Amino acid sequence: LFFFLILEIHNAQVTGLDGWDLFIDPGHSQDENMGINGYSEAKEVLQVGLELMNILNSESDIDTVYISRTNDNQSVSLYQRTNYANTVSASWYHSIHSDASSNPSTNRTLLLWGQRNNGEPDPPVGGEEMSSFIIDILTQGMRIETIGSWGDCSFYTWSDYCENSGGPYLYVNRNTNMPSQLSEQGHHSNPAQNQLVMNAEYKRMLAYLFFWSILDYHDIPRPQVGKLAGIISDIESTKKINGATAQVN
């Protein structure tokens, strides 16, 4: 159904991330937030997080990559996640999620960065700028619609939490000591999207979208990509084809 082809292009390790580290937080735990086709948000985002960790460690000179959980059996609280990141003094915190809607046709990306109730970014700043890179690259790579990049207090207008507390709204933005943001990579309540994320290569593609966003934020040239991704369909029936072979000339 989905293919992600890596061409044989050998690149030197990306440099420029030395001295910088990242805390990856795959949202939720175990089998939480079940998708419409039976594949949960928790399992989806864990695999994307692990792929991103592997890409950063193998293809860049990043100092350290931390991750809040490493398997589907762990149950990790919000406090444990943020406390871990604060304890290791991570340079950056990124929380990976997928979204849900009562409308199964809805499928969009969203970035949420820490914001004070007065509209200013929550210090230390950086989440807003990083989110501006991620939202464009993630949306273009997934080829779906987007809600955009928002400060969390501006987004959750139905709640008076920011007004009463000063913000930020999201726990992971409010309780981390480093710049942070949370991403929503489409909707697991969308049948087609939930099926796509069952594919390991699709999740690897999502991880590369985050990797390229990080490089762009740091003004580091991307290596030659050498990757093709897509869904193969029958030209007449438009039905998706499993087990197809793609040839690149």
Feature names for model-found ranges:
Residues I6-I9:
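N-terminal signal peptide c-region/cleavage motif recognized by signal peptidases
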Residues H28-D31, N71-S75, S98-N103, R116-E120, ...:
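Solvent-exposed loop/turn segments at secondary-structure junctions
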